[in-house]
From Swiss-Prot:
Keywords associated with the record: Peptide transport, Periplasm, Protein transport, Signal, Transport
Organism: Pseudomonas aeruginosa (strain ATCC 15692 / DSM 22644 / CIP 104116 / JCM 14847 / LMG 12228 / 1C / PRS 101 / PAO1)
Signal peptide from the UniProt entry: 1-24
Stored Pfam families: SBP_bac_5
Gene3D superfamilies (UniProt xref): Dipeptide-binding Protein, Domain 1, Dipeptide-binding Protein, Domain 3, Periplasmic binding protein-like II
Protein's name in the database: Dipeptide-binding protein
CDD domains for the chain: PBP2_DppA_like (cd08493)
Localization per record: Periplasm
Gene Ontology biological process terms, A to Z: dipeptide transport; protein transport
Similarity annotation: Belongs to the bacterial solute-binding protein 5 family.
MF annotations from Gene Ontology: peptide transmembrane transporter activity
InterPro entries the UniProt entry points to: Peptide/Ni-bd, SBP_5, SBP_5_CS, SBP_5_dom
Length: 533
């Protein structure tokens, strides 16, 4: 019988990150690209945060099947939908255990109280835990769940009822998203009593396949496999390590050297070498994503349509596709990818026309040499593998029409925080779909409810918003599509964004990794995954 070393013995044996070593089959190192802002997924909106939290440490009532967009039972074994489409009764799974750690020992199993705590904390600003630890839940509010969930009721220990104010065709898909990760009410009570509620974001307790062991910011995160997981066949790794490095070239070298077994977001320039490495495989799939420029319409001169039109048509998008994506990008036209149902193929892009752009700026009264800021992301993403280069190319394009753009960047968590606060003029942003529904694009990124969150253009159009909200209240997909197509036309006409590209997603990994599935939502899930050298 093969003996598995405990983590302490594994470390003591000198098997540390940064030096070549032979991995036991139960250990896996993931070369990650950034540190999570925290470990409470409901507070955040990025894949970096979710990789380290929701898909690793937590479960939801329903969750997406690995590698797909279908919502399947998880902490809820089944659910019933009322005839009016506004009530959902969830039948909870029995025998689910919360993590047991040196800072929390659960005395009971998962039940309805945990569901109530999770959602009431986000719904009620006067909730005792939220008052003790004030925080916002931007994704929850971006989707309008704070307004549409009328109440959450405990029917008994293993049944919970949600009542909505309006029909929401995407409700089950939304509950499968990271923001709906179930927290332990018992643990929250312990933290509240100890006067340390903020530790819910530092020392997480979930029901997920892995348990947090240690975290060193900007260096590594260590998890151990959850031996009490309710689906034990999914835990095939004893020790999961996130080795954090923001440099994609360094991550690629570490992967080739065997210092990690899987990474993400490779630079297009590194793909050929990774594909040719004898010890690696590089699966790929079309990206469910969009990289774009967002114009903050609350800042002058971006409040003028002519200015946004001018900046849009001054960008040489094809040159960016060629230089930044190097064959892995497709020209974007709309505010969501063509793989999303309801995408309107009749919409055409504005022509690249710097001369016309100059005319529009003159018409808008914008002086030659007007200065603005252009924010560039500090991280690589499939939808933007080199934001610095993209920003420099856009800067050069805008200089040709008399606009001086100063490039600004921040650490990723700060970048998102400041963007939500609206400090930018124009910024590079992007999105990978989170639930397979058009609402996740058209409402989350451009809707009025999202202007303090992921709608970083701060654009709120009443006619557009009416269409998007109406589509969410209809169950017939053809009718929803028609409404969403009308909304896409308004979005294109009003130019709160310049769509740049959709990209192919590549996921380089060792040939020893088995069972990993590329997520259409760009999540990196390691349950069901084995490393067998």
């Amino acid at each position: 019988m093969r003996k598995i070393l405990p983590l302490r013995a594994w470390l003591a044996a000198g098997l540390i990150l940064g030096s070549p070593f032979s991995h036991a089959a139960s250990n896996l190192v993931f070369c990650s690209e950034g540190s999570p802002a925290g470990f409470d997924p409901a507070q955040y909106t990025t894949g970096t945060d979710y990789d380290a939290t929701s898909v690793t440490l937590f479960n939801r009532l329903v969750q997406f099947e690995r590698g797909g967009t279908r919502a399947i039972p998880a902490l809820a074994e089944s659910w019933d939908i009322g005839d009016d489409g506004k009530t959902y009764t969830f039948h909870l799974r029995k025998g689910v255990k919360f993590h047991s750690t040196d800072y929390f020992k659960p005395t009971r199993e998962f039940n309805a109280d945990d569901v109530l705590f999770t959602f009431q904390r986000m719904l009620d600003k006067n909730h005792p835990f939220r008052k003790a630890y004030p925080t916002e839940f931007p994704y929850f509010t971006d989707m309008g769940l704070d307004k549409n969930i009328a109440r959450v009721e405990k029917l008994d220990e293993h049944r919970v009822k949600f009542t909505l104010n309006e029909v929401d065709a995407a409700f089950i898909q939304n509950l499968a998203m990271d923001v709906a990760s179930i927290q332990s009410a018992e643990y929250a009570g312990q933290l509240l009593e100890a006067g340390k509620p903020q530790q819910i974001n530092q020392k997480p307790i979930g029901t997920g396949p892995f348990i947090l062991s240690r975290y060193q910011k900007d260096a590594q995160i260590r998890f151990k496999g959850n031996k009490d997981y309710w689906k034990p066949e999914d835990v095939k790794i004893d020790n999961l390590i996130f080795s954090i490095n923001t440099d994609a070239a360094v991550r690629a070298q570490k992967l080739k050297a065997g210092e990690c077994q899987i990474t993400l977001n490779p630079r297009p320039a590194d793909l050929k070498a990774l594909q040719e490495a004898a010890n690696l495989k590089v699966p790929s799939q079309p990206g469910f994503n969009l990289g774009y420029i967002a114009y903050n319409v609350t800042h002058k001169p971006f409040d003028q349509l002519e200015v946004r039109q001018a900046l849009d048509m001054a960008v040489n998008k094809q040159a960016i596709i060629d230089a930044v994506y190097q064959g892995a990008g497709q020209l974007a036209v709309n505010g969501m990818p063509p793989t999303q149902w309801s995408y309107d193929e009749t919409i055409k892009d504005a022509p690249f026309d710097p001369a016309k752009a100059r005319e529009l700026l003159k018409k808008a009264g914008v002086a030659e040499g007007t200065e603005i800021t252009l924010w560039a992301m500090p991280v690589q993403r499939p939808y933007n593998p080199n934001a610095k280069l993209m920003a420099e190319m856009i800067q050069a394009d805008w200089a040709k029409i008399g606009i001086k753009a100063r490039i600004v960047s921040y650490e990723w968590g700060e970048y998102i925080k400041r963007a939500h606060a609206g400090e930018h003029d124009a910024m590079l942003f992007g999105w990978t779909g989170d639930n397979g529904d058009p609402d996740n694009w058209l409402a989350t990124l451009y809707g009025c409810d999202s202007i303090n969150g992921n709608n970083v253009s701060k654009w709120c159009d009443a006619a557009y918003d009416k269409l998007v909200k109406a589509a969410k209240r209809v169950s017939d997909q053809d009718k929803r599509s028609e409404l969403y197509k009308q909304a896409q036309h308004i979005l294109k006409e009003q130019v709160p964004i310049t769509p740049i590209a959709h990209s192919t997603v590549y996921q380089p990994m060792s040939k020893s990794v088995h069972g990993f599935k590329i997520s259409p939502f760009s999540r990196n899930a390691f349950y069901g995954v084995a490393n067998q050298p």
